[in-house]
């Protein structure tokens, strides 16, 4: 061993393993406006103190590793390390805690959701000292938000493009989701748009399969859009799914959609990945395309109460990465969504400033500094009887999407669309007249059905349909 190395070892470096809490648990730390703040639900292994578990999360998601290393001395750990600055027990849960962690902004690449998630929800989720770990919320500092483009256009620009104001937008997912030829698919699109819907939608797993290649689908759907626009005098759209196996192919599909003159494309942002999504969002802003986002695969990440990541974090990440619409549950249909929690992340998608509110699952006040908002999309097992509740819960700035609730109408696709449009217009008018949609909703729908045989038929078909299961979270 050289004399120089001996001197270094004697004054600073001590090999071995030490408790994380000695370095990464700092309860006296005062958070900075530039810190990214995280709230983790931590379930330690038996015998692991909560402070050690919280510190381990801070370490493993920032600068730490399992042992002391020489190169710690070559940088300033105090500047770059994550810090667990608070631990609180979860009410009603044994051996479960909320650990608050602050990350210095310099740990993250500007404008990269991919890099942010690689650190914060990376290897730490497989850490043996933890039985389970869930990221409940993030506070994104304004200085970091300003490095992102965000949604391609946002709510107001979309309304201006569509010339539609004062009501939720109506959509429909074309079913069956797989197996139709491009021409038959386009026919269903035309019938739904002609009947009164604003949008129709590719299902998330419609890409470019042998039974319907993407270019054929784009052509027939564009024809359906323009034909229905000419007949109704309204601007229409179909979410053309540009998701593909490579980013290059995805952009090629978006370019073709722009050349056809359609208003909107679609992306599966979790299966496609944040890098691909951000690239597509940039293309859409530069070329005047709206971007609809589907959250396929989200339940793999967010459904377990004790492990993974809450959807509100995925929603915040999407607003940074870019999207004009995103699916957000319904509260009332077949897909999970508890009302106050759902409205919490709906506000995080739409509003410019959201106050901390633990009753709605919001752990931090979030200032979006005028980043454009995202329209929440309610879809999954909804039909005309749900229209009053959906109108009340989601308000005007939303998309209400009825797949089976349109195409399952006994008289066909166009009458199904008519039924939904009449129900929506009736609910909006009743609300504007001061009526209570929550109490009078069924009566409002029945009154409207007297003047719309299409709505009356829909009411009869779905009068007994309910999806009643306990919520997971």
Curated annotation (Swiss-Prot):
Annotated positions of the N6,N6,N6-trimethyllysine modification: 14
What protein name applies here? Answer: Ribulose bisphosphate carboxylase large chain
Self-association and partners: Heterohexadecamer of 8 large chains and 8 small chains; disulfide-linked. The disulfide link is formed within the large subunit homodimers.
Q: How is the cofactor bound?
A: Binds 1 Mg(2+) ion per subunit.
- Required cofactor(s): Mg(2+)
InterPro entries, alphabetically?
RuBisCO, RuBisCo_large_chain_AS, RuBisCO_lsu_C, RuBisCO_lsu_C_sf, RuBisCO_lsu_fd_N, RuBisCO_lsu_N_sf, RuBisCO_lsuI
Molecular function in Gene Ontology:
magnesium ion binding; monooxygenase activity; ribulose-bisphosphate carboxylase activity
Q: In which residues is substrate bound?
A: 123, 173, 177, 295, 327, 379
**Sites bearing N6-carboxylysine, chain numbering:** 201
Identify the gene encoding this protein.
rbcL
- Mark the transmembrane ranges: none
């Amino acid at each position: 061993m050289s004399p120089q190395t001996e001197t270094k070892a004697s004054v600073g470096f001590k090999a071995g393993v030490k408790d994380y809490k000695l370095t990464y648990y700092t309860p006296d730390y005062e958070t900075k406006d530039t810190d990214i703040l995280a709230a983790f639900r931590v379930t330690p292994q038996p015998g692991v103190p909560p402070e050690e578990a919280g510190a381990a999360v801070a370490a493993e998601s920032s600068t730490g590793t399992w042992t002391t290393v020489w190169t710690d001395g070559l940088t300033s750990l105090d500047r770059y390390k994550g810090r667990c600055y608070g631990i609180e027990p979860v009410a009603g849960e044994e051996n479960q805690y909320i650990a608050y962690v602050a990350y210095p902004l310099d740990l993250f690449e500007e404008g990269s959701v991919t890099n942010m998630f690689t650190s914060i929800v990376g290897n730490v989720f497989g850490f043996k000292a933890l039985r389970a770990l869930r990221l409940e919320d993030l506070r994104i500092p304004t200085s970091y938000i300003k490095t992102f483009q965000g949604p391609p256009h946002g709510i107001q620009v979309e309304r201006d493009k569509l010339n539609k104001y004062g009501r939720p937008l109506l959509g429909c997912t074309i079913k069956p989701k797989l197996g139709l030829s491009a021409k038959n698919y386009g026919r269903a699109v035309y019938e739904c748009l002609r009947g009164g819907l604003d949008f129709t939608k590719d299902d998330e797993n419609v890409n470019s399969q042998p039974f319907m290649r993407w270019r054929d689908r784009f052509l027939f759907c564009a024809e359906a859009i323009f034909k229905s626009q000419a007949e109704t005098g309204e601007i229409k759209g179909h979410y053309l799914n540009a998701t593909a196996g490579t980013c290059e192919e995805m952009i090629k599909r978006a370019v073709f959609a722009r050349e056809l003159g359609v208003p909107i494309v679609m992306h599966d942002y979790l299966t496609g990945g944040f890098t691909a999504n951000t690239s597509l969002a940039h293309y859409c802003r530069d070329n005047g395309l709206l971007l609809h986002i589907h959250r396929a695969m989200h339940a793999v990440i967010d459904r377990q109460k004790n492990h993974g990541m809450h959807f509100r974090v995925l929603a915040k990440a999407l607003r940074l990465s870019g999207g004009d619409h995103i699916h957000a549950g319904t509260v009332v249909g077949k897909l999970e969504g508890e009302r106050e929690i759902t409205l919490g992340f709906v506000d995080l998608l739409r509003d410019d400033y959201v106050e901390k509110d633990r009753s709605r699952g919001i752990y931090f006040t979030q200032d979006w500094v005028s980043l454009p908002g995202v329209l929440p999309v309610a879809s999954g097992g909804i039909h005309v009887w749900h229209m009053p509740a959906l109108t009340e819960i989601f308000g005007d700035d939303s998309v209400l999407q009825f797949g089976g609730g349109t195409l399952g109408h006994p008289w066909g696709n166009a009458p199904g669309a008519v039924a939904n449009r009449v129900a929506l217009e009736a609910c909006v008018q009743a609300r504007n007249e001061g009526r209570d949609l929550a109490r009078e909703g069924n009566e409002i729908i029945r009154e409207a059905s007297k003047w719309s045989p299409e709505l009356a038929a829909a009411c009869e078909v779905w009068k007994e349909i309910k999806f009643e299961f306990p919520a997971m979270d």
